Amino acid sequence: MSEERPPLRIVISDPRAGDRVVRVKVKGVEDIEYTDDMRKTKESDRRRLPIARVSRKLYEELNLGEVGVLTLRFTTPDGKKVKVPFKAEVKEGLEDNVVEVNMELLGEAAGELETEADAFRAKSWQIAVPDDVHVKLAGLEIGDVFDGGLIGMPGLKFKIRGGTDATGIPMHPGVPGSGRYKVLLAGPPGFHPRERGERRRKSVRGRMIPDPRGERRKTALAQLNIVIHYGDKEE
């Protein structure tokens, strides 16, 4: 039996995230949902973002209302930096610089049940999507804009920026179709010249998202890069 193809990983970028960082106290609680599809492991990415409860003041200070995705950056007891993205929800009456997350998740991420972290509006995060979503994305190309409801983020628009397959071969905006081709390149994606004017024939994928049902595991599209589309002037 052939190996199951892993779900498509989507990397989302927010060009309006900014640089504002707030130091917060993070408390682990039992009454916040934490399911297997919210976990990130070595084998798989999250299908849904875990939930973080924040005060209204912090929600507004970090301008989370536009997108609602918060990153917490922890330092583990052994000094390792760990970043976890969350779907932010306002809890009325919560102390201004306190964030509540699931107790089990906090233990996995920070090795503590209560700790401090840097909180900021997420600049980028990633989720995995099932094949039925991948199928709906099939046929779209680099530069196309689609509705965020397709990936569980209604009210937002996303623009496709590129992607790579399981072997690291990138999608190329100048190549039509969804197959793999060898083309002469003078620059990225697919080739980074060391000398001025240098060109090389390299393998790239076409600019179109393929239907996953027709792809082999070893060469399937593995990652799609998208950006929140606020308007062409911001991209």
Curated annotation (Swiss-Prot):
GO molecular function: structural constituent of ribosome
InterPro entries in alphabetical order: Ribosomal_eS6, Ribosomal_eS6_arc, Ribosomal_eS6_CS
The keyword Ribonucleoprotein is annotated on this UniProt entry: yes
Source species: Aeropyrum pernix (strain ATCC 700893 / DSM 11879 / JCM 9820 / NBRC 100138 / K1)
GO CC annotation terms, alphabetical: ribonucleoprotein complex; ribosome
Single GO biological process annotation from the record: translation
Name of this protein: Small ribosomal subunit protein eS6
Gene of this entry: rps6e
Taxonomic superkingdom: Archaea
Pfam families with a match to the protein in the record: Ribosomal_S6e
Keywords associated with the record: Ribonucleoprotein, Ribosomal protein
Protein family (similarity comment): Belongs to the eukaryotic ribosomal protein eS6 family.
Lineage: Archaea, Thermoproteota, Thermoprotei, Desulfurococcales, Desulfurococcaceae
Span list, region Disordered: 190-212
